[in-house]
């Protein structure tokens, strides 16, 4: 059997390395490995979510809820929007992007992504026959090149992806830039990825009440600590949400994911503490790594940061390999379009792990 032509031409998406892989490859104890490659929450999930999951396990022989009104309302309350402006995805934010593509993308459409940015947009939309058009992220000034995006728009443009804070640079996009792009292009869907917005303490959610062509992606994998439960959500005008619900899989959110999400959202103290600890770790890492002359550390408003390592004498692959041998996983950014072979990305960890990581970096560079 031959797959569709587009599938034959695609490369597989390669996520960051797991602790199991590194433990096996380098004969290390899995529990001693510091994982900084996947932008996860290192502080664990909400205790209330864990308790709720335990209670719900007895019901997993039954299909999950098909109507998610209670969770939709909790997400609406958390986000400060109407319930009709919320859609929930059961495979993290990736399902939200996938349903967006199924709803709005026709074969031959184009979508714009500034580089570097999250690579999964391209991976998903190409499956539906859309063609990526690359705009620029100004790395020297570490900001979005808005003119590059505006100049790339044509009558085939269907979507523009704006990640804020941007992955992997950690930089916020000015609300004015989003407004300028959206207001001049009412027939183009502006997809604003806010997966990490809590760490920046900035959101563009009010724009969905002003613009019918703005869609905001969010996730519960980061601050909420539910990466393993796979739950994302989106915010937009009610019309867009209604269209998406027509084709969204009915039972994509598992029973365990549902109760985990619901109880995490109700655990306000957990959310506040998770944000505070994440920001504390980020600032500690930035301050300590910035003291190392050979590293070019980008300031970040997320739970990760981009680091240029050209002056170390290592390529990203070489540096990542040396760190892995000592039990540290970072993201080698060589595969990120828009970056060369001298960039890595690290995510936050506990303060104990932060200090251990700094010592290992100094050891590798000495």
From Swiss-Prot:
Gene3D superfamilies: Aspartate Aminotransferase, domain 1, Type I PLP-dependent aspartate aminotransferase-like (Major domain). Its cofactor is pyridoxal 5'-phosphate. Its EC number is 2.6.1.9. GO terms for biological process: L-histidine biosynthetic process. It catalyses: L-histidinol phosphate + 2-oxoglutarate = 3-(imidazol-4-yl)-2-oxopropyl phosphate + L-glutamate. Belongs to the class-II pyridoxal-phosphate-dependent aminotransferase family. Histidinol-phosphate aminotransferase subfamily. This is Histidinol-phosphate aminotransferase. It comes from Methanobrevibacter smithii (strain ATCC 35061 / DSM 861 / OCM 144 / PS).
